[in-house]
A protein has these predicted regions:
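A structural boundary/capping signal
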Residues: 1-176
Length: 176
C-alpha cells in the first residue's frame, strides 16, 4: 500500500505543476512589490511574511479541489497586498511569499512534500543562501544544510522543488 501511495504522490507532484500552468494561463504573471522594505536577511524576510499573515484567510480545498493547482506568485501577491486579502491554502500563501522573496533577490523555491497519510502534506517557501537551506512556513523559519534537513520528521514519501519563470509564465520543476 505504501508503494502505491508513493507512486501517487510522485505522479501528483509532477502533474500538479503542469495543471497549475494550464489552469492559471492568463492570470497576472508579474507585479511590482514594495521596494522600500529592509528584507536583507532571511530572518527579516520571515518576520515580514509572518506579519503578512493578517492579510490571509486559510481556505481548505473543497472535495472537487483536493490537491488543486498552485496559482502564479504575482496573482497571490496581488490578492494579498493590493486587493487586501488572499483566500487560499498553504500553496497560495507561500506563492505570494515566493513572489516577494524573488523580487528581493533571494534564490527562492516552492517546496511541496507529500506525507504517507497525505493529510499532512504541505507547501512552504524554501530559500537557498550561502550553502544553506531555509524553510519559511507561515513565517516560522527553519534552517538546514539540505532539503532533507528541512523536512525530516515529517514522514515524507515524496517532495519537489519548483520555481516560477516570469518570462515563460510558468512553474517548472527543479528537483523531485
Amino acid at each position: 500500500m505504501r508503494a502505491l501511495i508513493k507512486l501517487f504522490a510522485n505522479f501528483w507532484l509532477v502533474a500538479r505543476v503542469y495543471w497549475s500552468n494550464y489552469k492559471n494561463a492568463g492570470n497576472i504573471v508579474d507585479y511590482d512589490v514594495k521596494d522600500d522594505l529592509d528584507l536583507s536577511t532571511v530572518s527579516k524576510l520571515a518576520k515580514y511574511i509572518d506579519k503578512s499573515y493578517s492579510k490571509f484567510t486559510y481556505t481548505y480545498d473543497g472535495p472537487d479541489e483536493l490537491f488543486d493547482s498552485m496559482r502564479f506568485p504575482a496573482q497571490c501577491y496581488y490578492d494579498q497586498f493590493i486587493k487586501g486579502s488572499l483566500r487560499d491554502d498553504c500553496d497560495g500563501f507561500h506563492s505570494s511569499a515566493y513572489h516577494i522573496a524573488t523580487k528581493y533577490g533571494y534564490d527562492a523555491y516552492i517546496l511541496t512534500y507529500m506525507t504517507s497519510n497525505l493529510i499532512d502534506s504541505h507547501t512552504v517557501l524554501a530559500i537557498r543562501k550561502n550553502n544553506s537551506w531555509y524553510k519559511i512556513d507561515y513565517g516560522r523559519l527553519t534552517t538546514g544544510k539540505t532539503i532533507d534537513d528541512l523536512i525530516k520528521g515529517k514522514n515524507v514519501i515524496a517532495y519537489n522543488l519548483v520555481k516560477f519563470n516570469y518570462k515563460q509564465k510558468r512553474w517548472y520543476i527543479v528537483e523531485g
